[in-house]
Amino acid sequence: MLFWHTQPEHYNQHNSGSYLRDVLALPIFKQEEPQLSPENEARLPPLQYVLCAATSPAVKLHEETLTYLNQGQSYEIRLLENRKLGDFQDLNTKYVKSIIRVVFHDRRLQYTEHQQLEGWRWSRPGDRILDIDIPLSVGILDPRASPTQLNAVEFLWDPAKRASAFIQVHCISTEFTPRKHGGEKGVPFRVQIDTFKQNENGEYTEHLHSASCQIKVFKPKGADRKQKTDREKMEKRTAQEKEKYQPSYETTILTECSPWPDVAYQVNSAPSPSYNGSPNSFGLGEGNASPTHPVEALPVGSDHLLPSASIQDAQQWLHRNRFSQFCRLFASFSGADLLKMSRDDLVQICGPADGIRLFNAIKGRNVRPKMTIYVCQELEQNRVPLQQKRDGSGDSNLSVYHAIFLEELTTLELIEKIANLYSISPQHIHRVYRQGPTGIHVVVSNEMVQNFQDESCFVLSTIKAESNDGYHIILKCGL
């Protein structure tokens, strides 16, 4: 059972005005009028987020609060609505989608965030920066953690009901501090929550609200020791000095901010895993491109460097493949010049890590996938009569399969790869099932994907979802 921290009754959704008056009475908001007029109340943000962790007492007045967290410990974030339920009538859906991120607070690190996170991924293979503790969370639906975004999780929730998400931060602040003599001061992070509502197409892309707070993450129990140290330091100060600092609050109020610019993945719009549809003739590529009728592909960042590439082309290739820091160094190099360089040359010029990465990128060396499966859409397989398949000898009589390469071996990755293969949005695939004995449909879990036999063949069958806005996929054993 979820334990709710001791809080005043103004956390109740129907006493939102009283709750906001207490929030605005905090020292960092002293410049604001504590009493809310009806006009101001109408302009209140629709949502409020509260991190159930104490703020540091060593923060001066009018400065942003700072909260200490323990690595790997579950912390509750309460998702609250400020206004009356009638104010949510403009929402065209019962649910909203929230994305929680852990990002850098310092602007300097924000500019190099991608490189910083890639370095962390390299040093901590298989780990995530941010996780959601699903068993402790309440009132959230369809929680997701994308394998490509280690610092973000997302889920659906109903603003009209009580909801709490418990998060775990697995990186510590000193992991991004240059190591010199030990005891370096850790860098601050931010916990940011961006919430979206559905647009006319049923996609959660219309921004509703964003808020964030400043945190520092310590090794287990380190946050408690730091909080105690700050409290003891404040107790030694004079009463006049204490007036310059904020008191420590039991919870942390996330303050409004601009939305995070990167929204790379859309959540599934169907929260229920059940289905009651029947097999139908709708194809995955309906209204979109299929593998037999591909759309024109856009250039991607993993393209190969050609010997005929000019100096300008080589510069663009370096940018696309995340070698921008070496563009000035290779300002006069053409594609042929770069291709002539050996591995030792690049390691000596760029350093071991970037040199090896640049050499592999130049030579077009791809990492062998952990698993390969082959899929064929049922409509494609049945397009030619069976007798023609047996008697014919031309390629037109063959069932064409397409290779899917899996790295993470998760259901989410499988859905994304199938959606990409048939040029549809991943949100249109609600569930994936595998046809078992006697024709039963077994939900495909991460464990099942991990136990697929390498180079297995599947025929994809589709079932219309009960909400009529997507499909369920059934994997049948192929030929």
UniProtKB/Swiss-Prot annotation:
SUPFAM superfamilies: SAM/Pointed domain. Keywords: DNA-binding, Nucleus, Transcription, Transcription regulation. Its main location: nucleus. Disulfide bonds: none annotated. Residues 43-280 form the Grh/CP2 DB domain. It is found in: Nucleus. Belongs to the grh/CP2 family. CP2 subfamily. Highly expressed in placental JEG-3 cells and very low levels of expression in non-steroidogenic cells. No expression was seen in adrenal NCI-H295A cells or in adrenal tissue. Transcription factor that facilitates establishment and maintenance of pluripotency in embryonic stem cells (ESCs). With KLF2, acts as the major effector of self-renewal that mediates induction of pluripotency downstream of LIF/STAT3 and Wnt/beta-catenin signaling. Required for normal duct development in the salivary gland and kidney. Coordinates the development of the kidney collecting ducts intercalated (IC) and principal (PC) cells, which regulate acid-base and salt-water homeostasis, respectively. Residues 221-245 have a biased composition (Basic and acidic residues). This is Transcription factor CP2-like protein 1. Pfam families: CP2, GRHL1_C, SAM_3. The keyword Nucleus applies. It comes from Homo sapiens. Forms homohexamers via its SAM-like domain. Interacts with MTA1; which is indispensable for TFCP2l1-mediated self-renewal-promoting effect and endoderm-inhibiting action. One of its GO terms (biological process) is positive regulation of growth. The Grh/CP2 DB domain is required for direct DNA-binding. The Grh/CP2 DB domain is essential to maintain the undifferentiated state of embryonic stem cells. The SAM-like domain is required for homohexamerization. Residues 219-245, 271-301 are annotated as: Disordered. Residues 271-281 have a biased composition (Polar residues). GO terms for molecular function: DNA-binding transcription activator activity, RNA polymerase II-specific; DNA-binding transcription factor activity, RNA polymerase II-specific; RNA polymerase II cis-regulatory region sequence-specific DNA binding; sequence-specific double-stranded DNA binding. One of its GO terms (cellular component) is cytoplasm. InterPro entries: CP2 (IPR007604), SAM/pointed_sf (IPR013761), SAM_3 (IPR041418), TF_CP2-like (IPR040167), TFCP2L1_SAM (IPR037598).
